[in-house]
Swiss-Prot record:
UniProt entry keywords in alphabetical sequence: Calcium, Cell wall, Heme, Hydrogen peroxide, Iron, Metal-binding, Oxidoreductase, Peroxidase, Secreted
Location in the cell: Secreted; Secreted, Cell wall
Reaction catalysis annotation: 2 a phenolic donor + H2O2 = 2 a phenolic radical donor + 2 H2O
Predominant subcellular localization, coarse grouping: secreted
Protein name as annotated: Peroxidase 6
A Gene Ontology biological process term: hydrogen peroxide catabolic process
EC annotation from Swiss-Prot or TrEMBL: 1.11.1.7
Cofactor(s), names only, from the UniProt record: heme b; Ca(2+)
GO molecular function: lactoperoxidase activity; metal ion binding
Recorded family membership: Belongs to the peroxidase family. Classical plant (class III) peroxidase subfamily.
Function: Removal of H(2)O(2), oxidation of toxic reductants, biosynthesis and degradation of lignin, suberization, auxin catabolism, response to environmental stresses such as wounding, pathogen attack and oxidative stress. These functions might be dependent on each isozyme/isoform in each plant tissue.
Cofactor info, note text: Binds 1 heme b (iron(II)-protoporphyrin IX) group per subunit. Binds 2 calcium ions per subunit.
Organism: Cycas revoluta (Sago palm)
Length: 13
């Protein structure tokens, strides 16, 4: 899973 400036939501930040 790729993490950008804002988390997509599906991944736990």
């Amino acid at each position: 899973a790729q993490v950008e400036s804002v988390c997509p939501g599906v991944v736990s930040c």
